[in-house]
Amino acid sequence: MLAGTLLLLTACEQQTRRLTSSLEPDSADLHITEAPWESQAQMTRRMNHVTTYLKNATGLKVRYVPAINYAHSYALVERGEADLILVGIYGGYRLLKALPNAVPLVVQKPSYRLVMLGHRRWLEELETDEEPGLASVTGRRVGFGSRFSGSAFLQPLLAMQREGLTSADIDECLHEPVQRHLPAQVANGMVDFVFIPSHTDKNDQFIPEPLRDELAIVWTGPLDRNDYLIGVNKPMDKKQQSNLQKVQQAFLELDRTADDGRAVLDAYMLPGFELPTSQFPEATNHRIEALLSGSGGLPTCEAS
């Protein structure tokens, strides 16, 4: 499937990789990056699992290129400094729109679920005729992930859109790039609700143990997808095409029967990967396009 997709892509200006001055002469076959949705130490540990697995599965040397923030991770791909990127729905939408040679290689098997957290006291004090749910954000203070996060900002906006809500219905909001810090924003009273992703059957997986008595799940979305792997094809570079196909196949074969594969899936809390479908990311990107065109671009919690 990938081979046909890659060959059908029209040639465009080949990008030159600009390696950072701190790197020695580069012997890597491919470079991979990811938006830093957790601390850099955690990102590095996770990527070490990925590059080790890919080395064992394909024989390729894949170098991890750390990103300063979400926007920087996208820029690394746009500038040709990374050939592969693990993205959520916003990063994928942005890169596939900006780069004609960007190709979705694999997508996560359905395992993503959006979770809305509130204070347990608020839930207990609701009137009997009040139903907690997504509409509860109206007129409230809400915490999201990074403005460029798919799982913790764009996914909530899409969920709100399906309920006839927009970001204008929220009183105040804030962005917290490190998603694991979001539950504490409710506990300390900075916001009334936060949106966090769940990647397992445990929807409260990101609620820290000390906060479990204070916080409660207000609403959960349906089982869905958010993450996928994008590769940048170079139409005239047959070796690059072959390398991308090897990486694609390695991700498709990821399972927990071997230690290195189990380490990757456990690090990302995913059941595995499969080929892209007409629904994801294609149909999802159409919904994102409609959302952004209707709101004049990507909303933000920052004051203008």
For the regions a protein language model found, what residue spans apply to each?
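Beta->alpha turn/N-cap motifs
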Residues: 34, 66-70, 81-100, 108, ...
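A structural signal for short loop-to-beta-strand junctions that line the ligand-binding cleft
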Residues: 100-109, 143, 218
